[in-house]
């Protein structure tokens, strides 16, 4: 693993050492042998090692793949564990959480007790509704903290943000460990767990700067680790069920190999100010690539170094060649139609996933629920695959796949059979695999990296707060009005997921060409002033001697041959 970068670079050099005639006839590759061809093929799969961002210094000079492994372990153990909600709620039920809401007779026996009469995990509907509220509350808090953590990440750097997130995780699980029937601490426990989720996840994304040209893949690798963390509650609940260990002991044990481990990794291997973009203060952006559309190519070079007026003006011109929205201000990007639509898309995703998690035991048998618990941690598999697909064909097509998975999740849930329940569970696994990562990849490839943390934080905040709508949908409509029948809300969610295709189509249209809606630039005057300064700067004539978008100018701002946008 330590030599993977050098091997990839060597293979790339050997492939490009052929003369044109030899390469076309295959003689050069035959001379190099099968080993060289294999290394060349692997070099095409691995992230590039020949760009400045891939060669920057790391803590203790660790190989970037080792660092990625450490970050992935932290995300796996302390990521969005509360998304494994069916298992986590089962632990709360086993600990008699909110049992005081259920009526008792004179002898202190619960009447009725749905555990005995219907084989449910909960005693009464009131207890079930109270526990299920915790999920949307935790999701909303996590998204709220995502906005704050994004700002902290931009201002304070990854180290302090990661430490804060892990300490919040630790406090939350300690509260959960010491919750009892007489002293229920579930609300503060889940609040702290929610606060720590994205606060400990977002700082690990700084490693994407070590893999220029593969940011989509790296984000989804970390996202896959977060998806695998859905299995942590399943493991803990299995220990409680099969080994007679109390919820308290299991929760305390988890604190050591979860949050405490995260603190140690942060102190040793997390940079204080993020990874330097590269020696010149530049980073390599990667707009979505795909087939049949004509935006500028990927890996465009954005210069963030301080310089004279002419250098800044030249940078303004270069950024405009790629995508005007990238060079605009935060507020311009925030009020753009692209950002509005991706946030709207995520709001519907949060509604669909939240209600499904809450009502799973109402829609399916316990056998299907058990399959959901097992499949959710395996969502890291489609997460990685879809991440690579996003790099190849673009995030818009991935959004289409994700929405189709969500739609089929609800379509299969209408049929009251275990077979269709298993199909629904499989679709839900795919739907959850890129729950927030799909937004991360879209924002990363569309907007300025200077505002990455704030934009994804605000999108998560909006989706999280509005996910609370599913609480009254579940409690007031499904449980109270419809006597536990989720059919009405299932139909509503299915309709919303159908409407989602409209937003996806518009986002694809905005990426497909120079639509007048592309930028929604309310700072047009500022852009015109910047362009004027560029034209009046010293040396402007030399810089503009080539036609706009010509090969000579594009060669200065691209690292690899351009590909089409998805």
Curated annotation (Swiss-Prot):
Keywords: Amino-acid transport, Cell membrane, Glycoprotein, Membrane, Transmembrane, Transmembrane helix, Transport. The chain crosses the membrane at residues 65-85, 137-157, 158-178, 187-207, 216-236, 250-270, 334-354, 367-387, 392-412, 423-443, 455-475, 489-509. Its main location: membrane. The keyword Transport applies. Induction: Expression is not affected by changes in arginine or lysine concentrations in the environment. It is a multi-pass membrane protein. One of its GO terms (cellular component) is membrane. Glycans are attached at residue 476. Disulfide bonds: none annotated. This is Amino acid transporter 6-1. Disruption phenotype: Repeated attempts to generate a knockout failed. Conditional knockdown results in impaired parasite proliferation. Reduced uptake of lysine and arginine. Cationic and neutral amino acid transporter. Transports lysine with high affinity. Can transport arginine, methionine and leucine. Does not require inorganic ions, such as sodium, chloride, potassium, calcium or magnesium, for transport activity. It is found in: Cell membrane. It comes from Toxoplasma gondii (strain ATCC 50611 / Me49). Belongs to the SLC43A transporter (TC 2.A.1.44) family. It catalyses: L-lysine(in) = L-lysine(out); L-arginine(in) = L-arginine(out); L-methionine(in) = L-methionine(out); L-leucine(in) = L-leucine(out).
């Amino acid at each position: 693993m330590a030599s993977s970068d050098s091997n990839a670079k060597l293979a790339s050099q050997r492939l490009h050492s052929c003369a044109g005639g030899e390469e076309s006839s295959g003689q050069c590759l035959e001379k190099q042998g099968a080993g060289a061809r294999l290394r060349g093929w692997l070099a095409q799969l691995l992230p590039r090692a020949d760009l400045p961002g891939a060669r920057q210094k790391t803590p203790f000079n660790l190989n970037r793949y080792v660092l990625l492994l450490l970050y992935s372990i932290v995300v796996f153990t302390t990521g969005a564990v509360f998304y494994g909600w069916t298992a986590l709620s089962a632990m709360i039920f086993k600990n008699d959480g909110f049992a005081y809401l259920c009526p008792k007779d004179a002898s202190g026996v619960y009447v009725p007790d749905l555990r005995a009469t219907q084989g449910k995990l909960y005693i009464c509907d009131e207890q079930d509704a109270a526990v299920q509220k915790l999920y949307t509350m935790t999701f909303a808090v996590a998204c709220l903290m995502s906005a704050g953590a994004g700002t902290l990440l931009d201002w304070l750097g990854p180290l302090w943000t990661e430490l804060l997130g892990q300490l919040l995780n630790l406090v939350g699980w300690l509260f959960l460990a010491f919750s009892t029937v007489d002293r229920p601490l579930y609300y503060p426990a889940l609040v702290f767990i929610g606060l720590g989720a994205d606060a400990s996840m977002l700082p690990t994304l700084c490693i994407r700067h070590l893999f220029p040209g593969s940011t989509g893949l790296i984000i989804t690798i970390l996202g896959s680790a977060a998806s695998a963390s859905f299995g942590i509650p399943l493991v803990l609940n299995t220990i409680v069920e099969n080994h007679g260990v109390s919820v308290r002991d299991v929760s305390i044990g988890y604190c050591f190999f979860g949050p405490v481990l995260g603190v140690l990794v942060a102190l040793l291997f997390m940079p204080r100010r993020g990874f330097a973009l590269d020696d010149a203060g530049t980073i390599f952006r990667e707009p979505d690539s795909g087939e049949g559309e004509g935006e500028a190519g990927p890996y465009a070079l954005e210069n963030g170094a301080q310089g004279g007026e002419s250098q800044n003006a030249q940078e303004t011109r270069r950024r405009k060649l790629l995508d005007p929205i990238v060079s605009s201000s935060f507020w311009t990007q925030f009020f753009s139609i692209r950002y509005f639509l991706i946030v709207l898309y995520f709001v519907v995703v949060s509604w669909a996933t939240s209600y499904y998690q809450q009502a799973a035991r109402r829609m399916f048998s316990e056998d299907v629920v058990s399959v959901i618990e097992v499949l959710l941690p395996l969502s890291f598999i489609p997460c990685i695959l879809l991440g690579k697909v996003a790099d190849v064909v673009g995030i818009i097509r991935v959004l289409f796949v994700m929405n189709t998975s969500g739609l089929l999740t609800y379509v299969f849930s209408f049929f009251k059979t275990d077979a269709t329940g298993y199909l629904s569970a499989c679709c839900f696994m795919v739907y959850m695999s890129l729950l927030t990562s799909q937004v991360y990849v879209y924002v990363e490839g569309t907007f300025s990296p200077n505002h990455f943390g704030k934009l994804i934080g605000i999108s998560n905040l909006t989706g999280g707060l509005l996910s609370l709508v599913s609480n009254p949908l579940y409690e007031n409509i499904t449980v109270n009005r419809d006597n536990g029948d989720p059919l009405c809300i299932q139909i509503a969610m299915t309709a919303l997921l159908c409407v989602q295709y409209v937003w996806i189509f518009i986002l694809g249209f905005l990426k497909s060409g120079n639509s007048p809606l592309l930028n929604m630039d309310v700072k047009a005057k500022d852009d015109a002033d910047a362009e004027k300064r560029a034209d009046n700067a010293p040396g402007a004539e030399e810089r503009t001697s080539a036609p706009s978008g010509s090969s000579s100018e594009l060669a200065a701002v691209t690292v690899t041959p351009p590909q089409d946008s998805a």
